[in-house]
Amino acid sequence: MQAEILLTLKLQQRLFADPRRIALLKQIQHTGSISQGAKLAGISYKSAWDAINDMNTLSEEILVERATGGKGGGGAHLTRYGERLIQLYDLLATIQQKAFDTLKDDSLPLDSLLAAISRFSLQTSARNQFFGTLIERDHQQVQQHVNILLSDGKTRLTAAITQQSADRLQLSAGKEVLALIKAPWVKLVTDPALAGAADNALPGTVASIEPGNDHSEVIVTLTGGANLCSTQNNSELHALNLRVGSAVIAQFNADRVIIATLC
């Protein structure tokens, strides 16, 4: 759904940038002239001059440098700061549209900034991406363990992370995090006695099996409702005798969990 979202930036409670002013800056950048830029942007020369004065006055740095007089009203060019403003404005406009598009995804919690940003801007090769809240950090030296409660409110994960990384991510109880787990790192077992062989052992039910030549993809619905993907060697999968509806335990160690968050 393409929405018309008009981005307006204000500084000191005064208009700094809007679609018309950004269009003017782009035309000045293209033509090297305020008068030609104004004409192509569909505004008068006086309005263009006033807009540039306003932006240059409000901004911490000059956006447009100009030379008065001369043919066509004098030359002008954007400073590096002005060029970056255009880039930032276009970036914000893209983010606004992508954010609006998340309205169509009813499964996405819009009360989570991390979940929203990750969904429309973050692409990773990890098949398993779980949103959750950090509930505990052990503060050991060098390597630490953190416990994460997933957004289903039931499933808990343990992740291993270096002390330096935990400090850099500013991990503390209550912080929203994204846990990434690659599918080959997830092993499946059916014997509950083997559940203690890994740091994380999540019970669930086989939802689907996609066979391949050497490996197969197994989707497991966890007891909390989240889906987890595992790729299994076909010989191992055959030994487990899995089928849709089979009860399984998904296992992976804490050092196989990658943590991402907003700082």
Swiss-Prot record:
This is Transcriptional regulator ModE. It comes from Yersinia pestis. GO terms for biological process: molybdate ion transport; regulation of DNA-templated transcription. Belongs to the ModE family. Residues 123-190, 195-261 form the Mop domain. InterPro entries: Mo/tungstate-bd_C_term_dom, ModE, ModE-bd_N, Molybdate_resp_trans_reg, Mop_domain, Transp-assoc_OB_typ1, WH-like_DNA-bd_sf, WH_DNA-bd_sf. GO terms for molecular function: cis-regulatory region sequence-specific DNA binding; molybdenum ion binding. Residues 33-79 bind DNA. Keywords: Activator, Cytoplasm, DNA-binding, Molybdenum, Repeat, Repressor, Transcription, Transcription regulation, Transport. The keyword Cytoplasm applies. PANTHER family: DNA-BINDING TRANSCRIPTIONAL DUAL REGULATOR MODE, TRANSCRIPTIONAL REGULATOR MODE. NCBIfam families: ModE_repress, Mop, PRK10676.1. Homodimer. One of its GO terms (cellular component) is cytoplasm. It is found in: Cytoplasm. The gene is modE. The ModE-Mo complex acts as a repressor of the modABC operon, involved in the transport of molybdate. Upon binding molybdate, the conformation of the protein changes, promoting dimerization of ModE-Mo. The protein dimer is then competent to bind a DNA region, upstream of the modABC operon. Also acts as an enhancer of the expression of genes coding for molybdoenzymes, both directly and indirectly. Residues 1-120 are annotated as: I. Residues 124-132 are annotated as: Required for dimer formation and molybdate binding. Coiled coil: none annotated.
